Regions:
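Aromatic- and glycine-rich beta-strand/loop motifs that create alpha-glucan
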Residues: 1-25
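Hydrophobic alpha-helical transmembrane segments of multi-pass membrane transport/permease proteins
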Residues: 19-41, 62-71, 175-179
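Hydrophobic alpha-helical transmembrane segments in multi-pass membrane proteins
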Residues: 22, 26, 65, 108-125, ...
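Terminal transmembrane helical anchor/hairpin motif
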Residues: 41-54, 175-239, 246
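Helix-loop-helix units of permease transmembrane domains in multi-pass membrane transporters
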Residues: 78-108
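Secretory targeting signals
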Residues: 34-37, 54-59, 107-167
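Short alpha-helical transmembrane interface motifs in multi-pass membrane proteins
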Residues: 60, 68-73, 108, 136-141, ...
Length: 246
């Protein structure tokens, strides 16, 4: 446990001492603020959707574009940079396992990712001053944010174990996220296979987040996201083990 906490602490220090981290945080909050202002302005117009502001904020399409960019940026250096600089060999000669290294890096990246979302709580209280807030839906929305973050960080971490180049790692992660988001597009091609179409519907991340934003927590969605997260952490560990012997 001490080894794991040491790795988490090491990675968090690396994050918060990097100029890129603050650039990502500033850009993320600026875009989130702009999105919130646009949603408030749009829904305040007469005759617009009865959807709540927070539901539109968390369940809207633009929400996903943040993930496509942010997740690769915060994970691309995790292993790729250490492999390039040779520090991964030094780390693995310490009394730690590959599993501890991967888990520690995953936890640190997830903590950093979640820290990006903490300031958005301000928007919840802004809405509360003007209208009633469904706290169940708010809690479910942030649960969705955390689950999606865990999934996308684990995918980005896996991408980072596959190369020594941070940019290539980011491109691989970005491509992987496009594939995950693109699952619903396959739905229209499955006319005859009802069971396959149902499976695709179950893997529709857009619908998952739309449900979370409404306060609907489907355990199948939770299991799906946690299962994929576990799979990518497992693959990251195995990839690091293979890299150790190259």
């Amino acid at each position: 446990m001490k080894a794991l906490s040491a790795i988490v602490r090491r990675e968090l220090i690396a994050y918060f001492s990097s100029p890129l981290a603050y650039i990502v945080m500033a850009a993320f909050l600026l875009l989130q603020g702009a999105l919130f202002a646009l949603i408030v302005g749009y829904l305040s117009q007469p005759g617009q959707s009865s959807m709540s502001i927070l539901q539109a904020f968390f369940g809207g399409t633009i929400f996903f574009w943040f993930f496509l960019v942010v997740a690769p940026l915060i994970t691309m250096r995790l292993v790729a940079e250490e492999r390039r600089s040779g520090t991964i060999e030094i780390l693995l000669t310490a009394p730690v396992t590959e599993t501890q290294v991967i888990t520690g890096k995953f936890v640190a990246a997830l903590v950093f990712y979640l820290s990006l979302w903490l300031p958005t709580l301000i928007y919840v209280f802004i809405v509360k001053t003007q209208a009633s807030v469904d706290w169940g839906a708010v809690a479910a929305s942030y649960l969705g944010v955390a689950l999606f973050g865990a999934l996308f960080v684990s995918l980005g971490l896996f991408a980072s174990t596959l190369t020594r180049n941070q940019i290539i790692a980011a491109v691989i992660a970005f491509t992987g996220l496009i594939v995950l988001f693109g699952v619903p597009l396959v739905r229209g091609l499955m006319v005859s296979s009802t069971w396959l179409a149902a499976a695709v519907d179950h893997a529709d991340l857009w619908q998952h987040m739309a449900d979370y934003s409404k306060g609907i927590v489907d355990t199948r969605h939770v299991v799906y996201e946690l299962s994929l997260t576990g799979l990518f952490i497992f693959l990251s560990t195995k990839s690091l083990e293979l890299a150790k012997w190259r």
